Structure formats: C-alpha cells, structure tokens
Amino acid sequence: MAEEIPATASFTPYVHSQTLTSHNRAVSSVKFSSDGRLLASASADKTIRTYTINTINDPIAEPVQEFTGHENGISDVAFSSDARFIVSASDDKTLKLWDVETGSLIKTLIGHTNYAFCVNFNPQSNMIVSGSFDETVRIWDVTTGKCLKVLPAHSDPVTAVDFNRDGSLIVSSSYDGLCRIWDSGTGHCVKTLIDDENPPVSFVRFSPNGKFILVGTLDNTLRLWNISSAKFLKTYTGHVNAQYCISSAFSVTNGKRIVSGSEDNCVHMWELNSKKLLQKLEGHTETVMNVACHPTENLIASGSLDKTVRIWTQKKE
C-alpha cells in the first residue's frame, strides 16, 4: 500500500503496479534508458537484468536479458545515451561494458584497486566516469577501454559520480563529507562543496538543467545545492538514511519532484519547490536502495535489499 499524505489538488498518488523477482540477492541499482524503453537492474547476485518497458501494457516491465560475468556483486549500472551499451561497477574492482541487445560482454575496464562502486556515461557516451572504495574517480575512453585520467578525488570511498548534461563537468561524493565538481576534460577540481557539518555523503547527482546538485547525506537528509553560489537552497527530510548509499532522483514528467529510497522500506516523494512530502510508497520489505524515474511517463522503479524491483505508476483517473 502507498501511505496517503493529504493530497495537494494537483497531485495524483502513485500505486504499486508490478514486482520483478529476477534477482536472488539485494538490488543495488535501477536505471531507465534515456528513451524510457528499457529498465536495467543490478544486484549483489553478480548479475544485471534488463526489461522492456511498455506503459500501455500490463505488465509494464517484461524481462529481456541477463548479463553475467562479474566475479562479485554489482553496485551500479548505467546506460549509454543511445541505450546500446550498459556499464556496470562491481566489488570485483572492475567495470564491464556490455552489449544491451545481445547481453554479451564487450570489454572489462581494469584499474581500480578496491570495489568499483558507482559509474555513469557522459551524454555523448564516449566517456565513462567511475568511483571506487580506492578513493579515486577514474575517467575512461569507451572505444578503447583505456583509463584516461585518475583523479585523487577523496580521502574516503567515493559513493557517486555523475556528468552534467553537456558532459563538461563531473560531480563526485564521498564518505569524507565532500562533493567535488571536476572539469571532465582536464580532470581539475573546479569546486568543492562543503557544508558546516559535513556528514558522509551517500549520493549526488546533477539536476536535469545542470544548475543544481542533489546531495544525500547519512544524517537522513537530502539537500539541493546551487552550483554557482555553492550554497544549499532546499532540504528534504522525512526519510531514513543513516547507513546505506541510497539513490535519489528528479521526477520531471508531472511537476518537479524529488524521489528517494529510504531505510524505512518506503519510496519517498517530495515536491521540489515547497519541500513538502507528497507520498510514501509502501510495499518493499527491506531498505529501498535506489530509485529511477521514467523520462517521459509518470513511472518510478525502485530496488531494494528485499531482492525485488517494484514498478509504481500514478493511479488512473
């Protein structure tokens, strides 16, 4: 059930639509392709799964492909912009690049000296950025699989990495309490965002317009930072995040929202501007580790320690 919070007139609550049970260990990452036609999930069971997404049909998600080859659990997965490739980050210290259609392994990117924890493509999809428990951020050439740059980014494990919308900047976060913004061409640090308290940062991502970053910290808080002023503008609370690196997302298909996983087993959704908690989506039986918002439809995917992926849709009027 989705817990109802008194609705604002314009908000239609989300409801549980489907549960995917392809994985046999915790689900660590869920991502939609940029065209919204595919969903990928990665797991501690060492596999990635893809599903076709058809919002007209029931069920919405249909399993397509299984990707196997990592020697240890997978922490993150990302699609290339054209959805031809997937990259994964694993506790086996490697990244792997996969062919989405065939499920075959294209290449293994070797260089990190500890768990590879987070990964993303740039919008042009000719570069990959990764973060690791070895405290570095690495930039890779997709075509050759070679490491282009090693950034001595942080003094603790790197928890998230993301490119902005034109690929010129990278943001990284770490348990060291810092978010850093890097020039992706030179590898130079152009800005460090520091809060007064600096709790460990569990997640970071650029806003769709690239002007803001959404930062999750292990004090049960999400903050929206303005990059140019290096000040935080808004704070979102009500969820629980004190232990895990839980992802959050921007939902832009029907008003501007912030969506996050939580250690209370719910998906939380806030109105971006008012910071009002709109809804808690109930159904998972363990921590919700990650969420993804569909690019064009009012559709959310969530992955949990309970080994399932859940699909949530807005109630039909």
From Swiss-Prot:
GO terms for cellular component: nucleus; Set1C/COMPASS complex. Disruption phenotype: Eearly flowering. Decreased TATA-binding protein (TBP) levels lower Ser5P Pol II levels near the transcription start sites (TSSs) of target genes and of Pol II at the genes 3'-ends thus affecting the transition from transcription initiation to transcription elongation. Significantly reduced trimethylated 'Lys-4' of histone H3 (H3K4me3) levels at the 5'-ends of WRKY70 and LTP7 genes leading to reduced transcript accumulation. Strongly expressed in developing embryos and endosperms. Expressed in shoot and root apical regions, and in vasculature. It is found in: Nucleus. SMART domains: WD40 (SM00320). The keyword Aminoacyl-tRNA synthetase does not apply. Pfam families: Beta-prop_WDR5. GO terms for biological process: methylation; vegetative to reproductive phase transition of meristem. Its main location: nucleus. WD repeats lie at residues 22-61, 69-108, 111-152, 153-192, 196-235, 238-280, 283-317. Forms multiple COMPASS-like complexes involved in histone methylation by interacting with different histone H3 'Lys-4' methyltransferases such as ATX1, SDG14 or SDG16. Binds to target loci chromatin, increasing H3K4 trimethylation and causing activation of the gene. Up-regulates FLC and MAF4 expression to delay flowering. Present at the promoters and at the transcription start sites (TSS) regions of WRKY70 and LTP7; this occupancy is ATX1-dependent. Involved in the transition from transcription initiation to transcription elongation. Part of a complex composed of TRO, RBL and WDR5A. This complex is formed during both vegetative and reproductive development. Interacts with SDG14, SDG16, RBL, but not with TRO. Interacts with ATX1 and K4-methylated H3 tails. One of its GO terms (molecular function) is methyltransferase activity. This is COMPASS-like H3K4 histone methylase component WDR5A. Keywords: Methyltransferase, Nucleus, Repeat, Transferase, WD repeat. It comes from the Eukaryota. InterPro entries: G-protein_beta_WD-40_rep (IPR020472), WD40/YVTN_repeat-like_dom_sf (IPR015943), WD40_repeat_CS (IPR019775), WD40_repeat_dom_sf (IPR036322), WD40_rpt (IPR001680).
